[in-house]
Amino acid sequence: LAAVSVDCSEYPKPACTMEYRPLCGSDNKTYGNKCNFCNAVVESNGTLNLSHFGTC
């Protein structure tokens, strides 16, 4: 099973859109979109990973 990944190299960003395209993090939390998820990845110092696309 290949690991799912998202390119977060352009993050963090100061503001995210309200666009709803959910991603499920390795913390079993649903993030509303890539921006919200990538900001959380940066804050976690890389310990947070993408579990899968869609809600948890």
UniProtKB/Swiss-Prot annotation:
It comes from the Eukaryota. Its main location: secreted. Disulfide bonds join 8-38, 16-35, 24-56. InterPro entries: Bifunctional_prot_inhibitor (IPR051597), Kazal_dom (IPR002350), Kazal_dom_sf (IPR036058), Prot_inh_Kazal-m (IPR001239). The keyword Transmembrane helix does not apply. It is found in: Secreted. Residues 6-56 form the Kazal-like domain. Glycans are attached at residue 45. One of its GO terms (molecular function) is serine-type endopeptidase inhibitor activity. Pfam families: Kazal_1 (PF00050). CDD domains: KAZAL_FS. The record marks 18-19 as: Reactive bond 3. The keyword Secreted applies. GO terms for cellular component: extracellular region. Keywords: Disulfide bond, Glycoprotein, Protease inhibitor, Repeat, Secreted, Serine protease inhibitor. Avian ovomucoid consists of three homologous, tandem Kazal family inhibitory domains. PANTHER family: OVOMUCOID-LIKE-RELATED, SERINE PEPTIDASE INHIBITOR, KAZAL TYPE 2, TANDEM DUPLICATE 1-RELATED. This is Ovomucoid. It comes from Bonasa umbellus (Ruffed grouse). The lineage of its organism: Eukaryota, Metazoa, Chordata, Craniata, Vertebrata.
